[in-house]
Amino acid sequence: MGHMVDDLKMVDYYVGKGANGLELDVTFNSNGVAEYTFHGVPCDCFRSCTRYENINTYLDYVRQLTTPGDPKFQEKLIFLIMDLKLKNSPSSYAQFNAGINIADKLSQYYWKDDGKARAYFLISVPYVSQTAFIRGFQHRFEEKGLEKYYEKIGWDFSANEDLNSIRAAYQKLNITGHIWQSDGITNCLTRGDTRLKEAISKRDTPGWHINKVYTWSLDKVNSIKYALNLGVDGVMSNYAETLVTILSEDPFKQKFRLATYEDNPWETFKP
């Protein structure tokens, strides 16, 4: 998965490098209205932090790339991670509105052809204290009759919080599936593997409802290989081609491959 893919030029770049998933950073105003795909300073080392695009334009563009039959269709692109930047929407009211707004934007700009665009979306909320966003999203889906698109939506809490706290948050939301768990840190720093190993263990433990575990943002060959050997389901990187190359080599090509549209992102992989 390509990391911090926040303008159309970078979308084309990462798709061209073989990424089957892209992460986009979504910024909101104080009222919870999504405005741009934008990360800002600080960001990963050796990257530009200030690339951006209007969120409506971005969603319409990736709609074209993920719609079979469209002249711009890219078959390998199947997964989009929306990394929500909710710091400008600190109140529960604004976060609830942000959930409503993202549901609206997906229906207006991505699914506007009655769902012909086929990518899956992982909605990545930073903190368990921000579950008002999820409630707003769910409210709008049900209010507008968008429930059929739930099969395209998954959830993640991305701030490396305690896994038991995350589990409790999902229980309060009555979410028991379509759950990915992330673990990671900027490529400028190193991070231990204790929580990542714990997440993988919980994924394989009945009752935890974690379907996939991914790590970010890994750029070095040895770091990516180590994560794969631990058993992660996904790797987010600034260098998508590095992972593509690793997966073409022994011994990894015997165990792993890039996911395709035929793979269900909400099912736990059983080797």
Swiss-Prot record:
First-tier enzyme category under EC: lyase
Location of this chain's protein in the cell: Secreted
Domain of life: Eukaryota
Residues involved in Mg(2+) binding: 23, 25, 83
EC nos: 4.6.1.-
A Gene Ontology term for the protein's cellular component: extracellular region
Claim: Lyase is one of the keywords in the record: yes
Residue numbers annotated as active site: 3, 39
Co-factor remark: Binds 1 Mg(2+) ion per subunit.
Requisite cofactors: Mg(2+)
Keywords: Cytolysis, Dermonecrotic toxin, Disulfide bond, Hemolysis, Lipid degradation, Lipid metabolism, Lyase, Magnesium, Metal-binding, Secreted, Toxin
Function: Dermonecrotic toxins cleave the phosphodiester linkage between the phosphate and headgroup of certain phospholipids (sphingolipid and lysolipid substrates), forming an alcohol (often choline) and a cyclic phosphate. This toxin acts on sphingomyelin (SM). It may also act on ceramide phosphoethanolamine (CPE), lysophosphatidylcholine (LPC) and lysophosphatidylethanolamine (LPE), but not on lysophosphatidylserine (LPS), and lysophosphatidylglycerol (LPG). It acts by transphosphatidylation, releasing exclusively cyclic phosphate products as second products.
Record-given protein name: Dermonecrotic toxin SpeSicTox-betaIF1
Organism name: Sicarius peruensis (Six-eyed sand spider)
